From Swiss-Prot:
ANK repeats lie at residues 229-258, 269-299, 301-328, 332-361. Oligomer in an uninduced state; disulfide-linked. Forms activated monomer upon changes in cellular redox potential. Interacts with TGA2.2. Interacts with NRR. Residues 1-27, 525-544, 551-582 are annotated as: Disordered. Pathway: Protein modification; protein ubiquitination. Residues 391-526 are annotated as: Salicylic acid-binding core (SBC). PANTHER family: REGULATORY PROTEIN NPR2, REGULATORY PROTEIN NPR3. It comes from the Eukaryota. Keywords: ANK repeat, Cytoplasm, Disulfide bond, Metal-binding, Nucleus, Plant defense, Repeat, Ubl conjugation pathway, Zinc, Zinc-finger. This is BTB/POZ domain and ankyrin repeat-containing protein NPR1. Signal peptide: none annotated. Residues 1-12 have a biased composition (Polar residues).
């Protein structure tokens, strides 16, 4: 017979086991209830069309995402989750004399929400979506690949620019909205990858950490130490960071003996004078300073400076001086083309390549210009579909230009069969070039603008391709009639033909994909009159598609001209004067 105590012990053991099981079941039920609550609240944000009748505010993001830049939100949810947003909505409610949208909802500009920091850190559409989604669901979703992955196939996508920039944007928005848990999470994520981040990208993280201030002190201190010990020059730092941070860097470098007390890491006064002249867009002053013999463009790294910090026209004017080595390296081992790849300005890259910049040159760590550009470009920008007639993304254009330059196989010869057939007919050649470049402007506006800027087309007189229609007064001094009979080659004709020919050559060299499309269209003998029964359905469809594109472009140009106060009475077969680059 078992002792009574054993029964008591077993009874308690069974009771404890049952209690644990019941506790686990209760915990699981609580977790499931919280998960459903999270999903239900998230649905109100993730399915804006289904919950549009409940949304009472919209946040407008510059540039937007896809079809629009407005994100529909619910003030009660955001106010409950973010003290900052609660204060914003409370102040606007107190002020309350309107401010609603057409549907009665309140519209807030993201830059206004982010305050002064919004001018320094541009929070993108996808980054804001992630922050708002967290406020609704309490969970951090997967990072969007289109916004966080670069184009370089060899990249691990841990410390590349798109990944770093996205995390920095989320961190800044979360800190501004006073969402402590999300701020801490992304601060930890950035701290974990800092050692893998390219030194130039440290400046972005440091800027954001400085704006977040007390909420990101660990990140701020770590970034500051890494920048102090880096090879980033003082000019780059001065252009990227606020004065108080610059002072901390100078003091730290002085204490470590990394710079001398005399110049504190800055270039001498003669170089600084050249830089100030470039900042003032005064290339003539640069020329005068060079005559003093105190320095030269290479020693001053003037081309590097202009490419990184000045308007593209300054780079072109400096190159035209022919006084600098276009393949000169700065102390960090970057050629001018490497700097241009970082800036991602197609016109500057093409200008350098036409002057002999070598795309195969590598940095000290083994990267070519095209690899630099790829590491900076988001997959969403590169692989996204561009609507016909709309500008191509600059990032993608830069990569295509650099890849084509590396192939070293630009298309040679005449622009196309049609131009070759024009033979000695100067009028025919001019008409062909005008039509080709005009078509390029409609179908590939960004590529055409780059080539035309390099060729300086806007410095020549446009030809009137109409059939006797008089151009408006605003254009009479900027057009030349090609319909004069007999046609006589004049100086302005020659200048125009030279510029247009160079435009076509640049297009074939750097934009072969676009040039091939234009070749097929210009060489196509399809004519509206010849579209009879013998015309293939495919050819007929192609003609009508092209006709739709041209008609759409014409109507858009006409509306824009009407808004600008220009006369809309010019012939529909005439292309308007090219606007000067702003």
């Amino acid at each position: 017979m078992e002792p009574p105590t054993s029964h008591v012990t077993n009874a308690f053991s069974d009771s404890d086991s049952a209690s644990v099981e019941e506790g686990d079941a209760d915990a699981d039920a609580d977790v499931e209830a919280l998960r459903r609550l999270s999903d239900n609240l998230a649905a109100a944000f993730r399915s804006p069309e289904d919950f549009a009748f409940l949304a009472d505010a919209r946040i407008a993001v510059p540039g937007g995402g896809g079809g629009g830049g407005d994100l529909r939100v619910h003030r009660c949810v955001l106010s409950a989750r973010s003290p900052f947003l609660r204060g914003v909505f409370a102040r606007r409610a107190a002020a309350a004399a309107g401010g609603g949208g057409e549907d009665g909802s309140e519209r807030l500009e993201l830059r206004e929400l982010l305050g002064g920091g919004g001018e320094e850190v541009e929070v993108g559409y996808e980054a804001l979506r992630l922050v708002l989604d967290y406020l609704y669901s309490g969970r951090v979703g997967d990072l969007p690949k289109a916004a966080c992955l670069c184009v370089d196939e060899d990249c691990a996508h841990v410390g590349c620019h798109p990944a770093v920039a996205f995390m920095a944007q989320v961190l800044f928005a979360a800190s501004t909205f006073q969402v402590a848990e999300l701020t801490n999470l992304f601060q930890r994520r950035l701290l974990d990858v800092l050692d893998k981040v390219e030194v130039d990208n440290l400046l972005l993280i440091l800027s954001v950490a400085n704006l977040c201030n007390k909420s990101c002190m660990k990140l701020l201190e770590r970034c500051l130490d890494m920048v102090v010990r880096s090879n980033l020059d003082m000019i780059t730092l001065e252009k990227s960071l606020p004065p108080d941070v610059i002072k901390q860097i100078i003091d730290a470098r002085l204490s470590l003996g990394l710079i001398s007390p005399e110049n504190k890491g800055f270039p001498n006064k003669h170089v600084r004078r050249i830089h100030r002249a470039l900042d003032s867009d005064d290339v003539e002053l640069v020329r005068m300073l060079l005559t003093e013999g105190q320095t030269n463009l290479d020693d001053a790294f003037a081309l590097h400076y202009a490419v990184e910090h000045c308007d593209s026209k300054i780079t072109t004017e400096l190159l035209d001086l022919a006084l600098a080595d276009v393949n000169h390296r700065n102390p960090r081992g970057y050629t001018v083309l490497h700097i241009a790849a970082r800036r991602r300005e197609p016109k500057i890259i093409v200008s350098l390549l036409t002057k002999g910049a070598r795309p195969a040159d590598v940095t000290f760590d083994g990267r070519k210009a095209v690899q630099i550009s790829k590491r900076l470009t988001k997959q969403g920008d590169y692989f996204g579909v561009t609507e016909e007639g709309k500008p191509s993304p600059k990032d993608r254009l830069c990569i295509e230009i650099l890849e084509q330059a590396e192939r070293r196989d630009p298309q040679l010869g005449e622009a196309s069969v049609s131009l070759a057939m024009a033979g000695e007919s100067l009028r025919g050649r001019l008409l062909y070039l005008e039509n080709r470049v005009a078509l390029a402007r409609i179908m590939f506006p960004m590529e055409a603008r780059v080539a035309m800027d390099i060729a300086q087309v806007d410095g020549t007189l446009e030809f009137n391709l109409g059939s006797g229609a008089n151009p408006p007064p605003e254009r009479q001094r900027t057009t030349v009639d090609l319909n004069e009979s007999p046609f006589i080659m004049k100086e302005e004709h020659l200048a125009r033909m030279t510029a247009l020919s160079k435009t076509v050559e640049l297009g074939k060299r750097f934009f072969p994909r676009c040039s091939n499309v234009l070749d097929k269209i210009m060489d196509d003998e399809t004519d509206p009159v010849s579209l009879g029964r013998d015309t293939s359905a495919e050819k007929r469809k192609r003609f009508h598609d092209l006709q739709d594109v041209l008609q759409k472009a014409f109507h858009e140009d006409k509306e824009e001209n009407d808004r600008s106060g220009l006369s809309s009475s010019s012939s529909s077969t005439s292309i308007g004067a090219i606007r000067p680059r702003r």
